[in-house]
Structures are given as structure tokens and as C-alpha cells.
Amino acid sequence: MFLVDWFYGILATLGLWQKEAKILFLGLDNAGKTTLLHMLKDERLVQHQPTQYPTSEELSIGKIKFKAFDLGGHQIARRVWKDYYAKVDAVVYLVDSFDKERFAESKKELDALLSGWSSLAHCFLFLDNWVTRIEHPICCLRKMNWRYHMGANGASPLARGKVNLADSNVRPVEVFMCSIVRQMGYGEGFRWMSQYIK
């Protein structure tokens, strides 16, 4: 089996074989998870009803084929988040920047999610979904404010920057500003995430 895995790994590295990964879309209700999933799948911007039951979609981004799980963000759905996140390669956590009143609630859910860090996915991609146009100076301020509220600055066991998964129990994390409506920013986040997909 080692030889087969090695061979397919070489093909994937050379771009001759498509990688496969499971990712989990999490965040409070109305953060944009289902909208992002459908934008990635077929580039359709449609207003969705709140996700009541877990759904999954298959999509390709670059040379990676993803099976994406959208569990919903309402209080009942949050109870099953931990049942899924140990079985995926990456977690995409969305926050609606416009809804500042819910930052504390989102942080509480994030803290609960990260409490079982030993079984975390390989990486965490945080997307700060801002509906309006992204402009650099404002973007930086929002990013710092978001990290403050979310506790994403130096939070162990997560680390920003390039992380070698083989040498550490630390999981890579990065925050990207995005606007799903304007189709901006999230592509960079998924490119960052793809480097950690085996």
C-alpha cells in the first residue's frame, strides 16, 4: 500500500493526478456557508433558506476534488459539528463581519470547536465575509478587529504562516477577508488551504 500511495503522491505533486479532500463549512447561521458552497460549485449567487439538515457537495478547485459538508449554523446543527470535524482534512469557518453583535456567540462556538484540538483537521481557514467592497486599509483594520474578537492571535494549537505538519502537532490557520457576493478573497483562502491537503 505504501508504494501505491507514494506513486499517487508523486503524480499529484507533478499535477498529473487530482488530490481529494473533505472539507467542512462551519459558522453561525446566515454567515454565508451555503452561498459560498454554491459559488464554488457553479458560480451561482442565489439567496438560500437556512440550512436545516447536513448537506454535502462535490466540487473541484484547481487540482483538488473536494467533498464539502455544510452542516448549518443554527443552534441544533452546532451540536453535531464535532462529530464531523475529526473526519475532514480542513475546516472553513465563516464569520459575517457585518453582524458584529454575534461575534461573541461565534467566538463561543469556535472555542468549543477548538477544545478538542488533538483531533482537529489539518488546517483551519477563517473567512471574514464582508458583503461590501474590500479595500486594503479598511480590510486590515477589520482583520485585526476580527482576530481580536475571535481569539485568532497566537491561539494554540493553531499557528499562522507556513506550518510543517510532519514536524508538529500545530495546525495551520489563516484569516482571509472575502466578499462572496463580489466573488473576492475566498479564492486566495482556498489556494492557501490547498498546500496542506495531502
Curated annotation (Swiss-Prot):
Matching PROSITE patterns: SAR1
GO biological process, one term: membrane organization
Catalytic activity: GTP + H2O = GDP + phosphate + H(+)
Membrane topology: Peripheral membrane protein
Localization of this protein: Endoplasmic reticulum membrane; Golgi apparatus, Golgi stack membrane; Cytoplasm, Cytosol
UniProtKB keywords: Cytoplasm, Endoplasmic reticulum, ER-Golgi transport, Golgi apparatus, GTP-binding, Hydrolase, Magnesium, Membrane, Metal-binding, Nucleotide-binding, Protein transport, Transport
Major enzyme class: hydrolase
Regulation acting on activity, per entry: Small GTPases activation is mediated by guanine exchange factors (GEF), while inactivation through hydrolysis of the bound GTP is stimulated by GTPase activating proteins (GAP).
Amino-acid positions noted as binding Mg(2+) in the UniProt annotation, renumbered to this chain: 29, 70
Pfam families on file: Arf (PF00025)
Binding site residues for GDP: 30-35, 129, 180
GO terms for MF: GTP binding; GTPase activity; metal ion binding
EC number: 3.6.5.2
Keyword Transit peptide assigned: no
Cellular component, GO annotation: COPII vesicle coat; cytosol; endoplasmic reticulum exit site; endoplasmic reticulum membrane; Golgi cisterna membrane
UniProt xrefs under PANTHER family: RE74312P
Assigned protein family: Belongs to the small GTPase superfamily. SAR1 family.
Name listed for the protein in its UniProt record: Small COPII coat GTPase SAR1
Name of encoding gene: SAR1
